[in-house]
Amino acid sequence: MKIKTRFAPSPTGYLHVGGARTALYSWLFARNHGGEFVLRIEDTDLERSTPEAIEAIMDGMNWLNLQWDEGPYFQTKRFDRYNNVIDEMLEAGTAYKCYCSKERLEALREEQMAKGEKPRYDGRCRHSHEHHADDEPCVVRFANPQQGSVIFDDQIRGPIEFSNQELDDLIIRRTDGSPTYNFCVVVDDWDMAITHVIRGEDHINNTPRQINILKALNAPVPVYAHVSMINGDDGKKLSKRHGAVSVMQYRDDGYLPEALLNYLVRLGWSHGDQEIFTREEMIEFFSLGAVSKSASAFNTDKLLWLNHHYINTLPAEYVATHLQWHIEQENIDTRNGPQLAELVKLLGERCKTLKEMAQSCRYFYEEFAEFDADAAKKHLRPVARQPLEMVRDKLAAISDWTAENVHHAIQATADELEVGMGKVGMPLRVAVTGAGQSPALDVTVHAIGKSRSVDRINKALAFIAEREGQAS
C-alpha cells in the first residue's frame, strides 16, 4: 500500500505555526514511508476564503520547502463531484432531504437545552413521507447510523470511541446547493486515496462523522492521527500576544526556514535527547508513535537560539540567499562592500536573526551621516587624535590588504604608544563604523576597505578638531 498524506488548510488567513507543524508532520510521515504528500485547499467557506490567503499558504509552504507531490486541489472546483455523490446517496437511502424551517430547528434546540439535553436534530424528515414540491427549499442530511458506535485507533492518542446516538444527522448539502465541509473532506480523502489523515485535535469530533459517511459510501477508511494544540509559554492558546504566529512573519523577522522547521518538529515530537535535526534526519527518524498527546508550549527564546545556531552552521553562501531579501527591505546598496556570504561570517556570532544582521551592516556599504553620540562622546576625544593619526598612516601604507595586516597595524600603533589595544581600538572602531560595537576590529576594517577606512578616520579627526574648537 502506498502511503499518502495530505495537508488541507482553509484559506481564511495566513499559514500559522500550528498549521505549519501539521503540514510538516504529514510531509515527514509520507517521506519516511516513501509515500506521497498532497496539498488541498479547503475553500468551501466562500465568504471568508480569499485569494490573498491562498497565496499566503503557498508562500509559507514554499518558504519552508515542504513540496507537495499532488495539487494544489481546490474544493470549489469539485462541487459537481460532491453533488453527484450526494445524489447517489439520496437514491441509496443513506441521505435524505430535510425541509424543517429554521424556526422549527431553533425551537427544537431551545427545548432540548431547557431539558439539559445535547442539541441535535430529531430526525423528523428522516422518517417523513410527506410530499414536497421539487422547488421547495431543503437541505440534505446524512442518515447517520442510530445504533452502535464508531471506534478508531488514533495513532497518537490510542483508541477513541463515539456512540452513534451522540452523533447528529449531519447536513451535507445546504439549501443553496453547496456541499458542506465535512462531506467534501470525505469525498476528497476517498478520491485522492489518502491513507493517513494527520491533523489538529480540534478535528477529533469530526472524525466519527466522516468515518460513518465513508462506510456508507463503501469507501476505505484512512488511519487518523490528531496532533495536540500549541500553547504560548504561559500555557494559554498561542496568539499574537505571544509573538508572531504567521510563518511568513517569522521570515520577515529574520528567521531561517531550517530553524523554524527544526523548532516545529520538536514541538510535540522527540527522538531521544537530540535537539538539532537536519531535514534528512527528520525524515529518517519521524514516527507518529513518538508524538506526544500533551499540548506543547511555544518558546520564542528556544527558536531564537536555534536560528542563531543555523546562521552560524549552515553554509554562509546559503544563508546569504535569505539575507538578500532583508538587505533589500533595508534599501542597502551592497555593490561597494563585502559579499553577503562574507557578511554572514562577520556578523553571524553577533546577530541572532537575519533582520538584525541587515539592520546592523549598513556601515560596511554606505557612509554614515554622523557618529553615535554616546560612542563619540566617550571615544572621539582629543586624547584619541594621536592614536588615530598613527593607525591611519599605518593602514594607508599596507600594500597587501588582509585582516592579519590590519591587526598588525593596530597592534603596532598600541605598542609604539605604549598603551593598551583599547586606547587605539575603540576610537578606531567608532571612526570606521560610526558606533561603539562591531565584530572584531581587524576583520571589520578589512571588510570596509582601505580607502574607505582611511577616509572615515580623517572624518573622525575632523570631528575631534571641531569638538576641540567648540570647547575653547
UniProtKB/Swiss-Prot annotation:
SUPFAM superfamilies to which the protein is assigned, alphabetical: An anticodon-binding domain of class I aminoacyl-tRNA synthetases (SSF48163), Nucleotidylyl transferase (SSF52374)
GO molecular function terms attached to this record: ATP binding; glutamate-tRNA ligase activity; tRNA binding; zinc ion binding
GO cellular component assignments: cytosol
Entry's localization field: Cytoplasm
EC number per UniProt: 6.1.1.17
Residue positions of motif 'HIGH' region: 9-19
Keyword list, A-Z: Aminoacyl-tRNA synthetase, ATP-binding, Cytoplasm, Ligase, Metal-binding, Nucleotide-binding, Protein biosynthesis, Zinc
Sites where the protein binds ATP: K240
Binding site for Zn(2+): C98, C100, C125, H127
Record-annotated disulphide pairs: none
HAMAP family given in the database record: Glu_tRNA_synth_type1
Protein name: Glutamate--tRNA ligase
Organism the protein comes from: Klebsiella pneumoniae subsp. pneumoniae (strain ATCC 700721 / MGH 78578)
Taxonomic lineage from the root: Bacteria, Pseudomonadati, Pseudomonadota, Gammaproteobacteria, Enterobacterales
